[in-house]
């Protein structure tokens, strides 16, 4: 089949700048190239010229220039002369330019990656089947034009049953299928841990790993509060991957609060700052346990999968799609009771470390299983 993939219009594909959705696109493109299944054209903003990205027999890239002088000028003219209809004008410029090419092509399927708002404009220029690949809670009974979007689409593929249940609130007669995300498990299995001493830890420290941004929704404040309760256990340490207070110049009251709280336990916390994704497995494996204390409704919980793939026992919350992703493998606590339960759970694992390996054996999510399932679901 001839397939078009419309990306978010924010980050390029291939995922030279990272991005969870962009990485997942790369996985099924890579799998499709190996199996030679479909002719796929990816519509994306242009990556840096130094990336040396080339088409293959089965994959073609149609890039929208948003960074050169002429690209920025064209986008500026569009933004000044058009009002937004669904997304911000920069995303809608990307869609506008992509549709000019799509209208000339004869695709069988057009996949909308996490952009349900693309559906109606796409339906006006193409007779292809439209499939939404939904990574977040962006299509439910309260979403703009929800019923109209479902009418022009042929299917919705969701990353979890939680997201599926949110789409079902619309009450539309449209097929909805869950295909779980995947990661490169071999990269996590084969990774060698970073030397603890280079991070300032002792060999006998009990290291709790948090991977993610320093934002309220991710539960980082609740985790720091738990460590304040654990300050009488100096060998329990917190390793924060990817997050840092440094280099953030804008006024941020939430980060200011975190800074003040961290002062009381500064000898128990290490911030790594930015870490390239390819090194994440090496850093995760430094830990004894991972904590994903999400306080919002996680659509999937990719961070949980990464921790489990690294062989770490996991403490997380009962939010969104996390319980279905992590069943039988982790300690799931009620987010309403997190202030009472999180430090107790960390302390319990610290005192009962012989059980850690047993707790770390869990079901896994492989990128090739994901890619195979996803490409099967669009038939």
Residue ranges with predicted function:
Residues 89-93, 337, 351-379:
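A charged, aromatic-enriched C-terminal amphipathic alpha-helix characteristic of glycosyltransferases
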Residues 124, 252-275:
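Nucleotide-activated donor-binding/catalytic signature segment of Leloir-type glycosyltransferases, i.e.
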Residues 142-145, 165-168, 183-198:
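Acidic anion/phosphate-binding donor-loop and adjacent secondary structure
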Residues 157, 202-218, 224-227, 239:
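Conserved donor-binding/catalytic core segment of Leloir-type glycosyltransferases
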Residues 237-256:
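Glycosyltransferase donor-sugar binding loop
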Residues 313-316:
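Short hydrophobic beta-strand element within catalytic cores of glycosyltransferases
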């Amino acid at each position: 089949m001839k397939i078009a993939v419309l990306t978010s219009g924010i980050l390029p594909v291939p995922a030279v700048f990272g991005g969870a959705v962009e990485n997942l696109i790369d996985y099924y493109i890579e799998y499709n190239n190996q199996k030679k299944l479909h002719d796929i054209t990816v519509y994306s903003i242009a990556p840096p010229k130094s990336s040396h990205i080339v088409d293959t027999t089965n994959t073609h890239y149609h890039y929208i220039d948003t960074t050169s002088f002429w690209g920025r000028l064209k986008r500026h003219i569009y933004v000044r002369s058009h009002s937004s209809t669904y997304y911000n004008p920069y995303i809608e410029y990307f869609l506008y330019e992509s549709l000019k090419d799509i209208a000339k092509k004869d695709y069988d399927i057009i996949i909308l990656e996490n952009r349900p708002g693309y559906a109606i404009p796409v339906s006006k220029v193409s007779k292809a089947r439209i499939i939404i690949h939904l990574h977040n809670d962006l299509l439910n009974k309260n979403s703009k034009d929800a019923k109209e979007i479902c009418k022009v689409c042929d299917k919705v593929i969701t990353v979890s049953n939680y997201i599926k249940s949110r789409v079902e609130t619309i009450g539309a007669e449209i097929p909805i299928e869950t295909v779980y995300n995947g990661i490169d498990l071999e990269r996590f299995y084969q990774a060698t841990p970073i030397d603890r001493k280079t991070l300032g830890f002792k060999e006998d420290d009990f290291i709790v790993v948090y991977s993610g941004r320093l934002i309220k929704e991710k539960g980082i404040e609740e985790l720091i509060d738990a460590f304040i309760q654990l300050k009488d256990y100096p060998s329990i340490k917190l390793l924060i991957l990817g997050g840092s207070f440094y280099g953030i110049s804008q006024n941020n009251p939430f980060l200011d609060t975190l800074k003040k709280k961290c002062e009381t336990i500064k000898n128990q916390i290490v911030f790594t700052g930015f870490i390239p994704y390819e090194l994440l497995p090496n850093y995760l494996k430094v830990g004894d346990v991972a904590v994903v204390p999400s306080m919002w409704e996680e659509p999937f919980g990719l961070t949980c999968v990464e921790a489990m793939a690294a062989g770490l026992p996991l403490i997380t919350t009962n939010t969104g799609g996390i319980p279905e992703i992590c069943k039988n493998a982790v300690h799931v606590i009620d987010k309403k009771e997190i202030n009472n339960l999180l430090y107790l759970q960390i302390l319990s694992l610290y005192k009962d470390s012989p059980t850690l390996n047993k707790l770390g054996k869990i079901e896994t999510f492989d990128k090739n299983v994901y890619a195979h399932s996803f490409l099967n679901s669009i038939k």
